[in-house]
């Protein structure tokens, strides 16, 4: 059989394959699955990213602290030297006392390192107590009982201060008799100014103060009498000063008078000349030293 076929142009499959097939049909099932999986992974990564996380996005980011410039104005507490400048004596003493109470070793350093108190500085303190006592006295006519209980607290404070300060100026703590005698002179003058209560029961404060200061005088006089036979006591006019104090106290300085008589060997009865009496040419010691009594 002879069959004649009409010639036809050759057909290349790759030229018409994409033209006739839709995109959905051209993708294999495996390709679709891979596409969906990749998209899901991308969605998951986007969900876990810091930008999409609500927890991380709401957390404030830590910023570096701003460095304060040297010339920038900002509040700050005072330095210790400036703070101490603002404290008065009472405030500074209170702060120091509290520190020493909490730290006994610091208290010991203060005791050993502080300068020795002078007679004038202690007298100023005692005068402060005396001023408080004077301010506590009520105005007008009042009963002795009312007046006593009004001034009792500052009176006791003054007596206690005298008792505490006096041993500081007594031997052997104080080795200079002149300084001891200067303090006792000032302390005795303060005791003279204490009120004389009409009822005897209220006078025990002043009576006890006289007795204690008289014993202090006696101690200093006995120590001073060991030096140069007590000549310095008389040449400084202390025998006459003590005589005046004894007269003003109503004879309550018996211990001191006895010690002065023993140390010096005499006691000038003149009490009006005070310290200047030492230069009196008629004083007993000056007469002895000048030989007047020997020539008489």
From Swiss-Prot:
<dbReference type="GO" id="GO:0031144">
    <property type="term" value="P:proteasome localization"/>
</dbReference>
<dbReference type="GO" id="GO:0070628">
    <property type="term" value="F:proteasome binding"/>
</dbReference>
<dbReference type="GO" id="GO:0071630">
    <property type="term" value="P:nuclear protein quality control by the ubiquitin-proteasome system"/>
</dbReference>
<protein>
    <recommendedName>
        <fullName>Tethering factor for nuclear proteasome STS1</fullName>
    </recommendedName>
</protein>
<feature type="region of interest" description="Disordered">
    <location>
        <begin position="1"/>
        <end position="64"/>
    </location>
</feature>
<dbReference type="InterPro" id="IPR013868">
    <property type="entry name" value="Cut8/Sts1_fam"/>
</dbReference>
<keyword id="KW-0813">Transport</keyword>
<keyword id="KW-0653">Protein transport</keyword>
<dbReference type="InterPro" id="IPR038422">
    <property type="entry name" value="Cut8/Sts1_sf"/>
</dbReference>
<keyword id="KW-0963">Cytoplasm</keyword>
<comment type="similarity">
    <text>Belongs to the cut8/STS1 family.</text>
</comment>
<comment type="subunit">
    <text>Binds the proteasome.</text>
</comment>
<dbReference type="GO" id="GO:0015031">
    <property type="term" value="P:protein transport"/>
</dbReference>
<keyword id="KW-0539">Nucleus</keyword>
<dbReference type="Pfam" id="PF08559">
    <property type="entry name" value="Cut8"/>
</dbReference>
<feature type="compositionally biased region" description="Low complexity">
    <location>
        <begin position="49"/>
        <end position="60"/>
    </location>
</feature>
<comment type="function">
    <text>Involved in ubiquitin-mediated protein degradation. Regulatory factor in the ubiquitin/proteasome pathway that controls the turnover of proteasome substrates. Targets proteasomes to the nucleus and facilitates the degradation of nuclear proteins.</text>
</comment>
<dbReference type="GO" id="GO:0005737">
    <property type="term" value="C:cytoplasm"/>
</dbReference>
<dbReference type="GO" id="GO:0031965">
    <property type="term" value="C:nuclear membrane"/>
</dbReference>
């Amino acid at each position: 059989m002879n069959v004649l076929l009409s010639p036809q142009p050759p057909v290349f499959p790759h030229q018409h394959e994409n033209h006739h097939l839709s995109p959905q049909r051209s993708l294999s099932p495996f390709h679709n699955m891979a596409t969906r999986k990749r998209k899901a992974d991308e969605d998951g990564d986007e969900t876990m990213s810091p930008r999409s996380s609500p927890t991380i996005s709401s957390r404030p980011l830590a910023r570096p602290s701003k460095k304060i410039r040297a010339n920038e104005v900002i509040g700050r507490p005072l330095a210790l030297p400036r703070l101490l400048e603002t404290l008065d004596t009472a405030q500074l003493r209170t702060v120091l006392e509290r520190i020493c109470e909490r730290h006994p070793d610091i208290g010991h350093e203060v005791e050993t390192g502080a300068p020795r108190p002078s007679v004038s500085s202690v007298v100023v303190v005692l005068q402060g107590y005396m001023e408080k006592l004077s301010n506590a006295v009520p105005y007008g006519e009042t009963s002795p009982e009312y007046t006593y209980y009004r001034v009792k607290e500052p009176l006791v404070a003054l007596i206690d201060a005298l008792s505490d300060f006096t041993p500081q100026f007594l031997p052997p703590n104080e080795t200079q008799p002149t300084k001891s005698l200067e303090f006792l002179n000032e302390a005795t003058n303060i005791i003279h100014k204490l009120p004389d209560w009409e009822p005897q029961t209220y006078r025990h404060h002043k009576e006890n103060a006289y007795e204690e200061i008289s014993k202090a005088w006696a101690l200093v006089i006995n120590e001073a009498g060991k030096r140069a036979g007590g000549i310095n006591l008389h040449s400084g006019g202390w025998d006459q000063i003590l005589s005046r104090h004894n007269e003003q106290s109503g004879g309550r300085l018996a211990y001191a008078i006895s010690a002065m008589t023993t140390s010096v060997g005499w006691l000038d009865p003149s009490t009006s000349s005070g310290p200047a009496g030492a230069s009196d040419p008629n004083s007993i010691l000056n007469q002895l030293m000048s030989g007047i009594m020997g020539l008489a």
